[in-house]
Each structure stands twice: as structure tokens, then as C-alpha cells.
Amino acid sequence: RDGKFWLLWKSDTNAPHVRGEVEIFSQELSKDGISLVGEPTSIFGADATGSEIIENPDLVYYGNKLYLVFSAGWWADETYYTGTALCNSPQGACELFDFEAKSGTYLGRPVVGPGGVSVIDNGQETLVVFHSWVGGTAGTGGTRTSVVVTAEQLIKFAN
């Protein structure tokens, strides 16, 4: 909204040889998207979620507010979910928001471990793309599938 481009990433400190707090960082990009501007800023930590890991960060403007959307938990089982934080700016601070899309029944079908969210505004509606387990989980022979819904549908599912 401010005409600037931002890069988001998570620290990989959940790796066995590192062991530290997993955080999400943001840093401004140059107008051509090639160079970094300024210093990175930690905007959110996994400790706020009660999960050991957070990943797949995305900043989304929706309803005139800025949200950080992320996946939390372990992707291979039903504890994986999509969480949100409300942010003051792309540089933080971001605070956990009371909206989570967790495993459950959605539009008459089971959704297990929803994560990997991408948000797309096509000018007419806001679409949310995520993946979910079908027929079990990683340990029980399940497969991942993509799901595309409107933001309004996802909000109804999560509440």
C-alpha cells in the first residue's frame, strides 16, 4: 500500500544442530526487487503461538488492516494450521490475532493440517490458496491437496 516491496522469511533455528527461537523477519527491497534496503527486523516469533515452528509468512492487507499470515506446527500431521497476527506495519510489531484455520470439516469435507497459505486479490475477490491432507497424514498414507476458497469462506471456517 505504501508502494514499497518487502521480503519476508523465517529463521531456520528449529534445525536440530541450531536450536533457537523461530522468528519471522522482514526487510525492505529496492524498487527493482533485487537489493535489500536497511536492516532486517524480527516481526514475530513462534513463542507467541505456542508452537515450535512457524513458516510460510505472508503480509496481507484485508479490510484496511495489515495481517501476517503464517503456517505453524509440523506439516506432516493434523497439528499443522494457519495462523494470523495483526501488524502495525511491514516492520512490525505484529501481535497474535484471534483467527486460526485448523483441522476440521469445511464445506462438507475434512480439512487436515491446513497450511502453506497464499493470498491473491484478483480485483473482484480475495482468494486464499492452501494445502491440506486427504486420506490421512504423512504417517498414514495421506496425500496433500490444494484448496482454493474466498477469504470470506475461510473466515467462516475458522470461526
Which residues fall in each region the model found?
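Carbohydrate-active catalytic/glycan-binding domains of CAZyme proteins
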Residues: 1-159
